[in-house]
């Protein structure tokens, strides 16, 4: 990021099922509509994945399409309609604007992202669809009639991590290959230290671990109605998360206060990062200028050595006179050139040459220096 021009960005990334909603989205209307028991549907889906050596996400996407045949429309609009019926945890609907507004007051840009193996079309059917900068979720390809015909995007717990790198680098399009390019620290749009990942289960572990290991914030949430903390306890023991809290998104509740503290900390920390960046930049620029300066001296010495006319020698010495910090080794080399190159040697008594060489030989003591002083 360019610290001179931009506010720091905090990216808050969410799983969906059991993180923002108390249950799997498919289990809140769709599975029942195709005449299946929820547990039976998932058992069959998992068995298909096992028998066919199939990705579990692809398995349930296949089952959804297959089981809907002759029972319900399997279209984009129908899936969005199922999504509109998905229940959300308390406080979720006003959470995103509230947290974004809090960030603005703290001088931080807050962005919300979904990274879920759930179904994008259902998420887009909820009241939350416009709250996210990007929704990264599994999705279908639809024909001209809006009927799902093939998986378009499949997201599982391992490939979720690529989207964190996309967010970090600001390369958000899923087909943008620049995500594989090298970015320097100052080019990163959202450094991992400013990424928050909120999830509920072991399928979130790769993302949580990645965020944690790079200095970000991983938060495990649990259903406040059941108060079952077994998963978050295990994730905490295994160093997968930094914090855990009930999935209660209402204002002034534990999760709300925790995320606000992270935003405040980010605002302060980025001031220090800005100072560090500017100090580092100054040193790099200084080193670069020094390197250019040293190269200039080397080039002038070589030019003097290769000078093939009196006129050229005068021009080179004019440039050399503007440099004050010749090293002892460089000065001795200049003395040697003055004695060896006839285009320098025969004009030693010229005023500009003489005054320059008098300055160069000051404090030096050697046979070459003595010979040169005799000539000038």
Model regions and ranges:
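C-terminal cap/substrate-recognition subdomain and adjoining C-terminal extension
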Residues: 90-113, 117-333, 346-351, 358-376
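Alpha-helical substrate-recognition element adjacent to the catalytic core
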Residues: 1-144, 235
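Amphipathic alpha-helical segments within extended alpha-helical solenoids and repeat-rich scaffolds
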Residues: 338-344
